[in-house]
A protein has these predicted regions:
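Extreme N-terminal, non-catalytic leader segments
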Residues: 1-29, 92-95
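Walker A (P-loop) phosphate-binding motif
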Residues: 14-50
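Generic structural hydrophobic/aromatic packing signal, biased to beta-strands
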Residues: 30, 50, 59, 137, ...
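Flexible, glycine-rich phosphate/dinucleotide-binding loops
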Residues: 36, 66, 146
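Nucleotide-state-sensitive switch-loop elements of NTP-binding domains
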Residues: 23-29, 43, 52-121, 132
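Conserved catalytic-core segment of NTP-binding enzymes
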Residues: 112-171
Length: 171
């Protein structure tokens, strides 16, 4: 029996041949229970990357309580500010996701509106997932222990209906 020399074996890359799978829209949104944890900063950095690389992206500022100069709609002119806690705002958001040509939607969700946001997700998820939309929830862990609890609460509420990306922002 001979052993293959692993250094000479090239990894086989699987290519997505299903265009429908490759063209699926995705909603990337922030999760968290409190403000000031860096969610908007992270999302704006991600938006900067997409725009610099000329990757089409739709930005949505759903953090209606953040009226300061640090909100997503202030940082990126033309970004709609939508209250997803209302039926009209929810319809507006779903319409934007499905009608916009951009494959990716970056949504900055408000802190402190966790239960309302979960209700929003419950209403939105079924109709959007039927359209093939994928979801990515971004959470940030800081030195504040409540950020860890918030991420676990979100995971408990959203379960396996989303993918998760958690950043460790502790020093």
């Amino acid at each position: 029996m001979t052993r293959a020399n692993r250094s000479k074996i090239k990894p086989r890359m699987e290519k997505t041949t299903d265009r429908k799978q490759a063209d699926r829209k995705q909603i990337i949104f922030t999760e968290g229970a409190k403000g000031g944890g860096g969610k908007t900063t992270l999302l704006s950095s991600l938006a900067d990357f997409f725009l610099a690389e000329k990757i089409p992206v739709k930005l949505v500022d759903a953090d209606i309580d953040n009226k300061a100069r640090g909100s997503l709609s202030h940082l990126f002119k033309g970004t709609p500010k939508i209250d997803i806690r209302t039926d009209h705002g929810l319809d507006q958001f779903i319409g934007m996701v499905l009608d916009d040509k951009a494959q990716t939607v970056l949504a900055d969700l408000g802190a402190g509106s966790t239960k309302e946001t979960w209700a929003w997700f419950e209403q939105m998820h079924e109709s959007d997932s039927e359209e093939g939309v994928r979801f990515l929830a971004i959470g940030l862990v800081t030195n504040d222990s409540s950020t860890t609890s918030a991420i676990l609460d979100w995971a408990n509420a959203l379960q396996d209906r989303v993918d998760y990306l958690v950043f460790n922002c502790t020093s």
